[in-house]
Amino acid sequence: MAAAAGGPCVRSSRELWTILLGRSALRELSQIEAELNKHWRRLLEGLSYYKPPSPSSAEKVKANKDVASPLKELGLRISKFLGLDEEQSVQLLQCYLQEDYRGTRDSVKTVLQDERQSQALILKIADYYYEERTCILRCVLHLLTYFQDERHPYRVEYADCVDKLEKELVSKYRQQFEELYKTEAPTWETHGNLMTERQVSRWFVQCLREQSMLLEIIFLYYAYFEMAPSDLLVLTKMFKEQGFGSRQTNRHLVDETMDPFVDRIGYFSALILVEGMDIESLHKCALDDRRELHQFAQDGLICQDMDCLMLTFGDIPHHAPVLLAWALLRHTLNPEETSSVVRKIGGTAIQLNVFQYLTRLLQSLASGGNDCTTSTACMCVYGLLSFVLTSLELHTLGNQQDIIDTACEVLADPSLPELFWGTEPTSGLGIILDSVCGMFPHLLSPLLQLLRALVSGKSTAKKVYSFLDKMSFYNELYKHKPHDVISHEDGTLWRRQTPKLLYPLGGQTNLRIPQGTVGQVMLDDRAYLVRWEYSYSSWTLFTCEIEMLLHVVSTADVIQHCQRVKPIIDLVHKVISTDLSIADCLLPITSRIYMLLQRLTTVISPPVDVIASCVNCLTVLAARNPAKVWTDLRHTGFLPFVAHPVSSLSQMISAEGMNAGGYGNLLMNSEQPQGEYGVTIAFLRLITTLVKGQLGSTQSQGLVPCVMFVLKEMLPSYHKWRYNSHGVREQIGCLILELIHAILNLCHETDLHSSHTPSLQFLCICSLAYTEAGQTVINIMGIGVDTIDMVMAAQPRSDGAEGQGQGQLLIKTVKLAFSVTNNVIRLKPPSNVVSPLEQALSQHGAHGNNLIAVLAKYIYHKHDPALPRLAIQLLKRLATVAPMSVYACLGNDAAAIRDAFLTRLQSKIEDMRIKVMILEFLTVAVETQPGLIELFLNLEVKDGSDGSKEFSLGMWSCLHAVLELIDSQQQDRYWCPPLLHRAAIAFLHALWQDRRDSAMLVLRTKPKFWENLTSPLFGTLSPPSETSEPSILETCALIMKIICLEIYYVVKGSLDQSLKDTLKKFSIEKRFAYWSGYVKSLAVHVAETEGSSCTSLLEYQMLVSAWRMLLIIATTHADIMHLTDSVVRRQLFLDVLDGTKALLLVPASVNCLRLGSMKCTLLLILLRQWKRELGSVDEILGPLTEILEGVLQADQQLMEKTKAKVFSAFITVLQMKEMKVSDIPQYSQLVLNVCETLQEEVIALFDQTRHSLALGSATEDKDSMETDDCSRSRHRDQRDGVCVLGLHLAKELCEVDEDGDSWLQVTRRLPILPTLLTTLEVSLRMKQNLHFTEATLHLLLTLARTQQGATAVAGAGITQSICLPLLSVYQLSTNGTAQTPSASRKSLDAPSWPGVYRLSMSLMEQLLKTLRYNFLPEALDFVGVHQERTLQCLNAVRTVQSLACLEEADHTVGFILQLSNFMKEWHFHLPQLMRDIQVNLGYLCQACTSLLHSRKMLQHYLQNKNGDGLPSAVAQRVQRPPSAASAAPSSSKQPAADTEASEQQALHTVQYGLLKILSKTLAALRHFTPDVCQILLDQSLDLAEYNFLFALSFTTPTFDSEVAPSFGTLLATVNVALNMLGELDKKKEPLTQAVGLSTQAEGTRTLKSLLMFTMENCFYLLISQAMRYLRDPAVHPRDKQRMKQELSSELSTLLSSLSRYFRRGAPSSPATGVLPSPQGKSTSLSKASPESQEPLIQLVQAFVRHMQR
C-alpha cells in the first residue's frame, strides 16, 4: 500500500508516539527497545530534526526517479509553504497520504491537477506537519515521565534512552526555545500566497504550543537532574528577556485564545527557575546546619548577578515565586550580607500575591497537563511552601487563606499527604495546620479545607479521623465578657463558673463545657478569642452543627449555617470515599444527611452546593449498601417517585402519574435558571451507583421513576439548558449515558420479559428505541471525527490523548453512545415494526451525511483506538440487523473509507483489536452486505483463454491482508496474535459458508493457501487445563469447518491437489488420533471442573461442533479424508464414547450436559456408520449404560434430545449382534431404568393427549388406510422422541431376554403395562400418537413370544385396550362415507394407522399362539368385534393388490390360521362368522390362484387399477436386500429399462405376498375340513361338523367373484405351484429377491418350501373334501361318480408331473418353517424329509386307487 503513495515512508513521529504509549501492535520489550535505538537521535534533535529548505535537497528531489513528478511538484510547494527541507517535504507528503489522506490513491492525481483541491491538501498537510512536530516532543515528555517509574513495563528501555539523551538534551531544547520565540512570523511574501492571516495565526499557536512543551520538558529534566548555578543565570536572563512568555517577537499576533499557552510558558519558566534553586536540598542543609554544602553557597559572583536581576523583577505575576524562592535562598545562605535585598525581594513577592499565583499555577497545570508534570510541580511548590513556613513568620506572609488554598492545591498530589503526616507537626505545613486549629471551631472552614486535602489514602483518612476525634481546645469568640466566668488579674485566663451547653438546639447529641474549665484569652479587634482547655470529638460537634441546621432550616440563618455545614459534609465525603470502613463511625452524621436533603430542598432558594455534597456522600454509601441507602432515600421525597404503582410499559414511558420529587423541582427552579448543575451531576452518579448495586427486583422497580425522569426530562433536552461553565454540558451527557450503559449491562435481568412489570433494562430499550431520547444518542454519535479532532487540537495539553481534557470527555461520551446503541439493538425484542431508532440509524441521507457514513469515518480517528473500534462494532451490528446497504450509505466515499479500513488492517503497528474488529465487521458483511463485501474483496475480472472468466486480487483487496495474516512463514516476522489469526480465519470461513465462489476461486489458486490455512491443525496445543488462549481452539474449529465445506460442496475429482496432499498428511501424521484425543481431554477437563471455571466454554463448543462435522464428513468421504483404517476408526469412536461419558456423568452442570449432548449426536452417527468395524460390543455397552444413568439424573427438560440419542445408540448396539442377557452389563438395572423413563414419558403423553382432548383439538380423522402423521409441535409422540425410542429400546432388550424373567420382575415392580395399555387405549380411541401406538404394539408383540410375557400382557387387560378402541382406527370417517381399503402409496415402513391395525392383529395371533386356550375368549371377542373389517379385507385382495392391502390380508389370515385350531369353540360362539370366513377363505384362495396363474393380468391390474406406475414403496422395499444387484435406482428420471426392471420387481413382490396369503389360507382351511386319516378310517365321524368348502366343479377358475371356489380351484393352485417350482429350478424367476433374504440360495430354498407347503395343503384339502362328498348321503350318487372320474384323471395327470419333478429332487415342506404350522394331528406328509418326497405321491396314488375301487 505504501508503494501507492510513491515509495516507502519512514516511521512518522505520531507512529513512534503510539508505539511508545504501548497502543500499537509492537508491545514486546525488544520491539520498544529497537524503536528507541532506531529513533533516539530524532528525539535528541527535537524540533531541529526538521531542516530548512536548501538547494541541494531540492536537486535530490528532482533527481529521485522513485517519486512521481506530480508528487515532487506538490512536495516543493509544501516545502515553500512550511519552510521545510524539500526531501523531508516529499517524505512528509508520503506519510500523510499513507496515514491521514481521506481519499483513494487514484483521487490524488485529480487533486493535484485541481488548484483549489491541491491548496486544501497543502493546508491539511500543514496540520499534519504541526502534529508531527508536537509528537516528537510528546515522545520525549513520555520518556521523562516514566523512565524512573518502577511500575511501568518499559522503564528499563526508557531509562536507557534517557541516558543517551541526557547530556545534550537541555542545551539543544533551550536553543530551540530561543529560536522559536525570536522567529519572525511567516508572510505571504516569504511563504507563498497560501500564508493568509488565518494560517499565520495557526502557525503562531503551534509556535506557542511548542515553546510551552519545550519548557515542560526542561522542567521535568531538571526535576531529575541538578541545574548548575551558571545555567540558572542563563535561563533567568533568557526568561527575563522573553518576559516569561509575554514578550514574544510576534506578540502582536496574540489573541485571547492563545492566553492559555502564554500563561503556560510563564508558569513553566517560573517553575524551572524555582526548581533550579534547589530549595529542597537548601532546606536539608539548613536543618543540618551545613549551609555551605549548597551549590549556591560556593558561587558568590553568580549570586550577585542574580541579586541584580531579581531587583529588576516585580512587574509581572510570574516573577512572584522566583522572587520568594531567591529571597529564601539568600536569607538562608547569607542572612547578614543581604538582609535589605532579601527584604525588598521578599516584600515584592508578597505584594505580587505569590500564594494566589501558585494556586492558579497548580490549578492550571492540573486541568491541562500530564500527571507527572503536575505532581512534579506540586513537589517543587511543596518544598518551597514548607521552607517558607518553617523559615518565616506566618503573619508576614499575607492573607492566611491564600496560603491554605495553595497548600490544598499542593496536597492534591496523592503522595504528599503521606509525607505531611510523617513530618514534624511544628515545621512546614504543620505550622499552618496548627494555626487553623487555633481558630476551630469558631472558624470551621479553614481547618476542614486543609484536612480534606490531607486525605489521600486509607492511612491518611484514618489519621484525619483520629485528629478530629481527639481535639483538646475549643476556641470561642466573645464580643463582651460573659457573666459566668471569673477572669485572672491580668485578664489572660478565664475560668467557667457554670457548665455551658454549646448547642442549645443540638438535641440528644450535645457538647457541654464543664464548670471550672480554664480558657486562654486573646484580644482581637475588640473581641475576646477564648481557647478553652476542653477535650471533645469534633465529629460530635459536626453532628450538633447539622442538628442546628435542621432546626434553623426555616429561618433566615439557614444560608449562614449552610456555610458551616458544607465543609463538614465535604470532609465526610472525602473520608468515606477514601476509606469506607470509617463510615460506620460517622453514622450519626451520615444518617442525618437524609433529613438534610428533605429539609433543604424545600427552602425558598435551596443551597444547591450543600445538597450536591449530601448526594455525593450518599453515592459513596450506596456503593457499599445500596439497599439501605435506597430505602432511606425513598422516605425523603428527594428522588422522583410514583404515587400509585405503574405496571404497564406505556404508562411508564409516558411518565404517567410520576412525580419529579425534590430533585426534579430543584433542577427546574434552581439549577436551570442559575446554570449550575452540581446536584444534577451528583444525582446521576447516585442513580448509577444504585443501579450497579444490583438491587432486588422490587427496589429496581422503585428506580423506574428516576430512570424515566432522566430519559424523558434530561436526555432529550440537556444540551439546550443554560450553562455557566464550559464542559458541564458534556459531563452531564456523559453521566446520563453511563447510567443507561450500566442499566443495559445488568446481568441479573437476563430474561427481559419474565416478570409482569417491565424491568429497568426493558424500559431503557423501549425509551431509546421509540422516544426522542434515542434521537439525542444518535446526535451524540453524529458528532463526527472532524469535530473531535478539532476539540483535541485546540487543547493546550502537552500529552495528547492521555489525561482528562474536553476532548477526552467528548470521546468518552461518543464511545458510550456507541455502546448504548449497540446494546439497545442487541437486546431489543424482535418486532415487525421498525423502531424510530433503527430507522434513524439506517436511513439514507443526502450527500453521504447519514449516520452510517459518519460511523464509518471514525476509522480516521487516531487519538483513542477504542473509538473507531466501537464505531465498527456498531456498524457490524447494524449490518446484521438493519435492512439497508452500508455500501449505498457510504456513497462516493465508499472506496476511500475502504482504503482507510485496509490501511489500518495492513499496518504493521496498528492496535490489534481494531484489526480484529475490522475483520469481524467484514465477516458479518459477507453474509449481509453483498455490495460492501465486493468492494472490499476488490476482485478484478479478465476473460481467460478458454472464454471463461478469470479472477485476480485487486490492489485494494482485503484478501491481501488476510493471506498475510494466515501465512505460517510470515507469522514470526509479522506479529499475528491468536485473536487476530482467529478473526482472519473466521472471515475466510464466512466466504466459504456464503459460497463466494469468485473469492474462493482466487484463494484456491494462491500458492500454499491450503498449507497455510491448515497449519494450526498440525501444531500441538497445550492441555485444556493450561490453555491461556482459547481463541486458538476457535481458529482450529473454523479451519475444520472450511475443510468440511470444501469437501462437501466441491465435486470429488475437482478438489485442489494441495488440499488432497494436506488431507493425506493429516492422516499420515496421525492428526485424527491427536485431535480425537485432544477433544476427549477437553471433555474430561470440562467434566472435572464441572463446567464452572470454564470461561472459554463457547470455544470448546465450537471445537466439539467442528470436530463432529469433520468426522461426519469423514464417514461419508472416507477415501478423500484417508480415514479408512478400521483401527483408527475404532479408536476415534472410543474417544468420543469416553468423552461423552465423562461429560454426561456430571448431571448437575448445564454446561457439561450441553457439550455432552453435542458429542452424543456424533456418537450415534459414528455408531451407525462404522458399526461393522467397532469390534466388541461389550466395550460399548458398559460406557453407554453409565451415560444413560448420568442422563437420567440430569434435568429432564434439558436432556430430552440427549436421552433420545442415547436410547437410539443402545438400539443400534443391540442390533449389531445376537446377544444374551449375560452379555449385557447390569441388564436388569438397565431394563428398570428404561422402564422408569418410559413410565414417566407415557404418563406425560397420556396427560398431553387428554389435555388436547379437553381443548377439543383432536386431529380430524383421516382416510383410514392413509398414514395420519401430522407433525405436532413439541409433541411427545415424535418418531425420534424419548417415548417412542424408549419403547423400541425396551423391545430390543426384551428380545434378548429369552425366558422373560427380568421383564417379569420389572412388571411386578413398576405398573408399566397398565400405564402403556391405558395410554394405548386413549390413543387408539382418539386416533392420536401414531408413533407411540406402533412402538407399543411392537413391544407387546415381542413380550407375547414368551409364556410369562404373554401372560403378563393378557393379564394387564390387553383386550379392553385394543379390541373396541381399534374400531376408531378404521371406522367411518367424519364425512360419513364408508372406507374401502385404498392403495397406500407410502412406504409400508412408515408408521400408519392401517399398520397399527395389522400389528394389533399380529399381537392377537401371537398371544393366542403362546397362551392357546387361556386367551381364546379374548381372541374370539376380537374377531367378533372386527368381523366386518376381517371379511372386507379377505375380499379386497381380488380388487386391490397394494402392499398395504396384501400385508393386512396376510396378518388377518395368519390370525384366522391360529384361531382355526379352535374350530369347535369358534363354532360354538360365532357359528355364522365362522361360516362366512370359511367361504371368504375359499374365494381368497381362488383370487390368489387366479392372480398368480396369469402374470400378465396381474401386471395389467397393478398398472391400471392401482394408478399409473407402481407404489414407490415397492421400489424401496426391493432395494433393501444388499444382494439385490438388479434393484432399481430410485431416481425420478429412470431410463426405460430401469422402469421396466422396477415394474418387474414390484410384480415379484406382489406375487410373493399373494403366495404367502395363499399358503396361510390353505393351512387355515385345512382345519375346517375333516382330518384325512379320520375320514378315511373312522366310519363314525360326525360329518355335520364340517361344511363343504369347495364346489363340485373341475373347471379352471376364472377371475370372477360370482364363480364359487371348487375342486378346479385347488387343482389350479397345485398347477400354479408346480409351474413356479419349475421356473425356479430353471433360474428363470428373480422372484427370490422379493423374499428379502440375504442370499439368492436362501431365497430359493424359502420359496420352494412355501410352494411345497401350498401343494401339500392343496392335496390334503382335495382328499379331505372329496371324502366329505363321498361320505355325505345327501350328495347324489351320480355326482359322486362323476367326481371320482374327474378327480382320478386330474390327479393322475398331476401325479405324473409331480413324479417328474421329484425325480429331479424337491424341497421339503415348511410345515414347521416359515409359517405357523397346524398344531393338530400332523400327518406323515408334514414330516416328509427332503430326501424322499414319495410319501406325498404315495398318498395321492393310494387315494386315487381308493376312488377307482
Curated annotation (Swiss-Prot):
GO biological process, one term: RNA export from nucleus
MF-aspect GO terms: structural constituent of nuclear pore
Keyword set, alphabetical order: Acetylation, Cataract, Disease variant, Microphthalmia, mRNA transport, Nuclear pore complex, Nucleus, Phosphoprotein, Protein transport, Translocation, Transport
One family name in Pfam for this protein: Nup188_N-subdom_III
Ranges of compositional bias, category Low complexity: 1521-1537
Locations listed in the record: Nucleus, Nuclear pore complex
Biased composition (Polar residues): 1719-1732
InterPro entries with a match to the protein in the record: ARM-type_fold, Nucleoporin_Nup188_N, Nup188, Nup188_N-subdom_III
UniProt GO cellular component terms: cytosol; membrane; nuclear envelope; nuclear pore; nuclear pore inner ring
Entry-annotated residues carrying Phosphoserine: S1523, S1709, S1717
Residues bearing PTM N-acetylalanine: A2
Region (Disordered) residue spans: 1514-1542, 1707-1733
Modified residues (Phosphothreonine): T1712
Task performed by this protein: Component of the nuclear pore complex (NPC), a complex required for the trafficking across the nuclear envelope. Required for proper protein transport into the nucleus.
Known disease link: Copy number variations of NUP188 gene may be a cause of heterotaxy, a congenital heart disease resulting from abnormalities in left-right (LR) body patterning.
Record-stated family: Belongs to the Nup188 family.
Summary of subunit composition and partner proteins: Part of the nuclear pore complex (NPC).
Name of the featured protein: Nucleoporin NUP188
